[in-house]
Amino acid sequence: MIGIVQDQKLLIFDEISSAYDTDALAQTIKSRYPMNKIYVYPDASGGNRSTNATQTDIEILSGSGFSNQSPRSNPPVRDRVASVQALLCNGKGQSRVQIHACCRKLIESMELQSYTEKGEPDKESGYDHMADSLGYLIWREFNPLFARSGKPTGIRIY
């Protein structure tokens, strides 16, 4: 999914669900948004090398000119889900995320994502990927543990 942070709100306005691998995803992003600085928020496991790959997913994204914002390790699932819920509707009843109607896969994922009895996302249902991607973005940009918390603070190096 593609979005921007504006006035401390997250606006999701596009999604890419048809890319068959990370290289195809990077090319699609570059073709749709050739003039924009792109920040990516992948799953931290994207830095792991598989036995049949010469590059990790994060290396591919970084090599395509995107700024990697993934943490060294993924946040706890419950914390990430709570971060998404807080942006959807906080304690004051305010929503700080808007998802454009064209983002059908993300909306479907948000509506149909289920969880196991242990509280983990049900990976068998097939609805976890887009919801997870939204969670990683929100965790990184709006989590009060990070200095940014939805506000630009200049250059950050990790």
How should these model regions be labeled?
Residues M1-V5:
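Gly/Thr-rich phosphate-binding beta-strand-loop-beta motif of the actin/hexokinase/Hsp70
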Residues Q6-D122, P144-L145, I155-Y158:
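Mg2+-dependent endonuclease catalytic cores in nucleic-acid-processing enzymes, primarily RNase H-like
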Residues K123-Y158:
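Charge-patterned, long linear interaction tracts outside catalytic cores
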